[in-house]
Design a protein with these regions (language model features):
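Glycine-rich loop(s) and the adjacent beta-strand/alpha-helix scaffold that form part
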Residues: 1-63
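Structural signal for hydrophobic packing residues in well-ordered secondary-structure cores
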Residues: 5-9, 46-49, 119, 157, ...
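Generic structural "secondary-structure junction" signal
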Residues: 10, 16, 31, 60-63, ...
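A short, structure-level motif marking secondary-structure boundaries and short turns
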Residues: 25-28, 134-136, 164
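An anion/pyrophosphate-binding glycine-rich loop and adjacent beta-alpha core
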Residues: 38, 42-44, 48-159
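A glycine-rich dinucleotide-binding beta-alpha-beta segment and adjacent secondary-structure elements
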Residues: 163-208
Length: 208
């Protein structure tokens, strides 16, 4: 008999107990699942002699809200540049989700920002993202940051403006040339380019 119970992603103690893959799955890592997914069925089954299999196969999604684990407060598509809290690019953004999550966990507080401009912000002509949330509401709620210049955006994020501007400059060079000497990204399109005019957007993310 095989018993499937829905996992234990909301149980920090169990995550830490069985984790053999990730650098950290503590309280600072939210879950995209319901808070009710606490592994009770697994605990009860084990108590009556069930054999547990694959408990270490814990998947992370790299682009969740750091506080809630939700995915909907999102601006910026898959072509967008990702930078850490210091404003530095740290990964090939087109890597597999496990590579992206592992790279994010190595950054300060496990936090990163997706930076986008007009052509790659994933907003429709009326200002709604792909989840139906309006950009003005996201900005008002502090879920997304918006600024007319990259320097102003960096200040909102607590970064050195010069560092963010330089990261974007190098990224744009890679987009234009199709060659990314820092992280080996080879998949680019014209929408990946961060434009030289605002508004610019940033949403803070971490793995969940």
């Amino acid at each position: 008999m095989i018993l499937a119970t829905g996992g234990f992603s909301a149980n920090v103690e169990m995550r830490q107990k069985y984790n053999t893959i990730w650098e950290d799955l503590g309280e600072n890592i939210p879950t995209t699942n319901s808070p009710a997914i606490t592994g009770d069925g697994i605990v009860m089954a084990e108590a009556v002699g069930a054999q547990l299999v694959g408990m270490d196969k814990i998947q992370l999604l790299a682009i969740a809200d750091p506080e809630t684990g939700a995915l909907d407060a999102h601006v910026g598509d898959a072509t967008s540049i990702c930078v850490n809290k210091e404003g530095k690019r740290y990964v090939n953004e087109t890597e597999r989700r496990d590579v992206l999550a592992a790279a994010a966990l190595k950054q300060t507080d496990g936090i990163f920002y997706i930076i986008s401009s007009t052509q790659n912000n994933d907003l429709d002509e009326n200002g709604y993202n792909s989840y139906g949330l309006h950009i003005d509401d996201l900005v008002a709620a502090g879920e997304v940051y918006r600024a007319d210049t990259l320097e102003e955006l960096a200040q909102q994020l607590g970064m050195d403006p010069a560092v963010l501007v330089e990261s974007v400059r190098k990224f744009n060079e890679a987009v234009t040339s199709g060659y990314d000497p820092e992280f080996g990204r080879t998949v680019f399109n014209t929408h990946a380019l961060i434009e030289d005019f605002g508004p610019y957007y940033a949403c803070h993310r971490n793995p969940a």
